[in-house]
Amino acid sequence: TLKELGKLEEAVESYKKALNINPDYAEAHNNLGSTLETLTQYTEAVESYKKALNIDPDYAEAHNNLGQAFYLLNLTDKALDSFENALALNPEFVDAYNNMGGMLQDLGRLDEALNCYVSALAIEPDDAEIHRNLSTVKNYKPGDTQFDYMQALLTKNNLNDSDRINLCFALAKAHEDLGNKDDFFKLLNAGNELRRKELNYPIEKNLNIHSLYKDLFISTTNIIPAYEPLTIKP
């Protein structure tokens, strides 16, 4: 699609033309809203999502997207209602659980955020992004089954770099909680190496960072952004 190609303004015009032909095209309203949201036109995105829902009140994806737009406008109560509406319509809507978890975490409601991530993983246990998000609000204990599951996931050969990065950081956090210093630094370094590769970041800027962290061994929440939850997504 034009949006996937990064041609956002052209995508907006394309959706508007489609809606001129068929104003009751709920999916086009939703897609227009998603594109406007990407363009940071959040108020306009809300209006598009609302139009989609006026046509199809049971459109779970539009409820989820509306929740995201409300959250980006700092309308957190409305956002929560929208995420809950999406989940009432589709109790296995992983993105809605993940998005609601991210919002609740940002609001400091960590137990509720943890429950959202756990619910999402119960549906999609191989989702590396959600494993990472859960790791940001969880304190790992010996014998944790999620820890074992993440270790098994990381051995799979078909992981893309993004999934591997998420699992490395999630497992690094788990090893930190468990006091496994060497494994913590090994996985932290592996995740950062992959992320630098993904971002095309000059490696020479980080030649000494691993040894520096190992010497200090202080809480990573104060020195790197690796454990911050990922942003919500449509």
Show the residue positions of the predicted features.
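Non-catalytic membrane-proximal stalk/linker segments that position and tether the catalytic domains
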Residues: 141-157, 166-233
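Generic helix N-cap/helix-start motif at coil->alpha-helix transitions
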Residues: 126-128, 160-167
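Conserved alpha-helical positions within TPR/SEL1-like repeat arrays
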Residues: 1-4, 27-38, 61-72, 95-105, ...
